[in-house]
Amino acid sequence: MPNLTLADLQGEIQANVRTALAEDVGGGDLTAQLIDPQREAEARVITREHATIAGRAWVDEVFRQVDPRVLVTWQVEDGQRVEPNQMLFQLKGPARALLTGERSALNFLQLLSGTATRSQHYADLVAGTAVKLLDTRKTLPGLRLAQKYAVTCGGCHNHRIGLYDAFLIKENHIAACGGIDRAIAEARRIAPGKPVEVEVENLDELRQALEAGADIVMLDELSLDDMRTAVALTAGRAKLEASGGINEGTLRNIAETGVDYISIGTLTKDVRAVDLSMRLTL
């Protein structure tokens, strides 16, 4: 599946920010009203740790919606690796607006940069191999597209976006349809042209999936030896995706079996936010 780009996300970004501001600002920022509305200020945002940045567009949109007079000047790009205490961006505008938008802007940036940083770490572990690391649907509710974009900033790739853009036929689907061949045939009938992926648990099921014409076969917790056999058996007839039992210790060995993809839920579901700080100057 193709990776998301910012061009795909403009409406999503606006909606994400509207939701964030509605839950944080509500009917108005009480504390900001203590400040003279004519008071101008500047601010600098830094990172306190090593990170890979993602989320600039969400920060820009926060301040656009809070007060379009706020000027945001970036010192880094999405996908850029940064060092502790490095300045990420500067703000200039009404002090009230800077303080009202601060938390929402940093929430987006720290979360999405956390996703990008974890993705970059995993991508570094398989550097030099041909494998592509994929995200999953294990995302934060309401922020799937944002997190999937952040994954690409860290050098990994997008799997299907949701249940609507590709088939992923798993054990229960196969049982309900009466077999792998029937499930694939029905998928082709329902949505010709949509990618069809089938999850298998052994080499016999792999053979069935290949004979039925699957586009992608997910190898669920196969041993390294079985993965190597699967690569030889498939011989390019379908793409192979490894899934299950994957961690930092096993990732490189799995990549070196020759599979095309490795899907990793932890890229988006176990995110640790990057530590950021904003300092205001009046």
UniProtKB/Swiss-Prot annotation:
EC number in record: 2.4.2.19
Reactions that this protein is recorded to catalyse: nicotinate beta-D-ribonucleotide + CO2 + diphosphate = quinolinate + 5-phospho-alpha-D-ribose 1-diphosphate + 2 H(+)
Gene Ontology biological process terms in this record: NAD biosynthetic process; quinolinate catabolic process
Keywords attached to this entry: Glycosyltransferase, Pyridine nucleotide biosynthesis, Transferase
InterPro entries reported for this sequence: Aldolase_TIM, NadC, NadC/ModD, Nicotinate_pribotase-like_C, Quinolinate_PRibosylTase_N_sf, Quinolinate_PRibosylTrfase_C, Quinolinate_PRibosylTrfase_N
SUPFAM superfamilies hit by this protein: Nicotinate/Quinolinate PRTase C-terminal domain-like (SSF51690), Nicotinate/Quinolinate PRTase N-terminal domain-like (SSF54675)
CDD domains in the cross-refs: QPRTase
Cellular component aspect of the GO annotation: cytoplasm
Binding sites annotated in the UniProt record for substrate: 103, 136-138, 160, 170, 199, 220, 243-245, 264-266
The keyword Transcription regulation is assigned to this record: no
Associated pathway: Cofactor biosynthesis; NAD(+) biosynthesis; nicotinate D-ribonucleotide from quinolinate: step 1/1
Pfam families for this protein: QRPTase_C, QRPTase_N
Gene Ontology MF, one: nicotinate-nucleotide diphosphorylase (carboxylating) activity
Family as reported in the entry's similarity comment: Belongs to the NadC/ModD family.
Function noted in UniProt: Involved in the catabolism of quinolinic acid (QA).
Subunit structure of this chain's protein: Hexamer formed by 3 homodimers.
Protein name in the entry: Nicotinate-nucleotide pyrophosphorylase [carboxylating]
Organism in which the protein naturally occurs: Pseudomonas aeruginosa (strain ATCC 15692 / DSM 22644 / CIP 104116 / JCM 14847 / LMG 12228 / 1C / PRS 101 / PAO1)
Chain's gene name: nadC
